[in-house]
Amino acid sequence: MAGTDREKALDAALAQIERQFGKGAVMRMGDRTQEPIEVISTGSTALDIALGVGGLPRGRVVEIYGPESSGKTTLTLHAVANAQKAGGQVAFVDAEHALDPEYAKKLGVDIDNLILSQPDNGEQALEIVDMLVRSGALDLIVIDSVAALVPRAEIEGEMGDSHVGLQARLMSQALRKITSALNQSKTTAIFINQLREKIGVMFGSPETTTGGRALKFYASVRLDIRRIETLKDGTDAVGNRTRVKVVKNKVAPPFKQAEFDILYGQGISREGGLIDMGVEHGFVRKAGAWYTYEGDQLGQGKENARNFLKDNPDLADEIERKIKEKLGVGVRPDAAKAEAATDAAAAADTAGTDDAAKSVPAPASKTAKATKATAVKS
């Protein structure tokens, strides 16, 4: 009896909350539709797989940080290009005033439709971010970078003035405001951040990111990007080998790593990453310097194989799909079931056609000949 009274009291409270705050303000978790996490591809298959869900999750805060010239902006511009290719609207808040439109265009960004803001101070930048996110019309917004979000008081003050904690308070307030709006509008916010050294650290890493601790807490995904090797063509440097570590991940297991090539003037080499992943998972075979896929030669040396895949995008898509299917990343269960059902139906149709072919009567001419032969014998 007591249990029934408690259930009635709970139902009454839930009904009152819905009347006061609107439908969906509170619900039983089982009543929610379990939709797969929507993502934006990073441009690197290896990194999409390391993230566990096939890309950067929609409606979340993402932080990308690393040393100078490590590929932070390049990685972000690839995400911008992929969001636009999927029909999304993207905004870029260039607090550093350093975005190169020509380079962005080379990476596939539609600069004609990219919403760009170059604010004067940190308050203005984050106010613009808040207004754009609350419009509900964006799929992705990029802030480059947190370190360049200089508070108004610091800009208007003297050069030697101390402004301890101003930027951290600004970031904390902004993230409190926009996090809910990001989730409701399914907008991904990428904050690019820089590294600083903590003075007097004896043990552990002395590196830290700018903007206080708020971003560390509010970010669903944190990516640490580092340049690990210089790629050379003879004596000329043509790119960097880059490693990204998923330091924090609220949508999949963290601490996974991905490596890929960033080529100067071209960005992330998707085809090079597919070759590496294909060899690792047994889809692409390497014998000496030759790379082959299902008996077909891709080329001698990684560069030739990379160019072959670039010239044959359908083949590259096929290899990527097989890798993701094997690892169970980016494959929706309902889509997999639908595909299996379609395959089964196609197999049934084929079998029916074969049976029908077997029971087709002999042509009339042959039947006539057989009748004549029987008559002659008799």
From Swiss-Prot:
Residues 338-378 have a biased composition (Low complexity). Keywords: ATP-binding, Cytoplasm, DNA damage, DNA recombination, DNA repair, DNA-binding, Nucleotide-binding, SOS response. Gene3D superfamilies: P-loop containing nucleotide triphosphate hydrolases (3.40.50.300). GO terms for biological process: DNA recombination; DNA repair; SOS response. It holds the Pfam family RecA_C. Residues 333-378 are annotated as: Disordered. GO terms for molecular function: ATP binding; ATP hydrolysis activity; ATP-dependent DNA damage sensor activity; damaged DNA binding; single-stranded DNA binding. ATP binds at residues 66-73. SUPFAM superfamilies: P-loop containing nucleoside triphosphate hydrolases, RecA protein, C-terminal domain. InterPro entries: AAA+_ATPase, DNA_recomb/repair_RecA, DNA_recomb/repair_RecA_CS, P-loop_NTPase, RecA-like_C, RecA-like_N, RecA_ATP-bd, RecA_C_sf. Its main location: cytoplasm. It comes from the Bacteria. Coiled coil: none annotated. One of its GO terms (cellular component) is cytosol. It is found in: Cytoplasm. Can catalyze the hydrolysis of ATP in the presence of single-stranded DNA, the ATP-dependent uptake of single-stranded DNA by duplex DNA, and the ATP-dependent hybridization of homologous single-stranded DNAs. It interacts with LexA causing its activation and leading to its autocatalytic cleavage. Belongs to the RecA family. NCBIfam families: tigrfam_recA. This is Protein RecA. The lineage of its organism: Bacteria, Bacillati, Actinomycetota, Actinomycetes, Kitasatosporales.
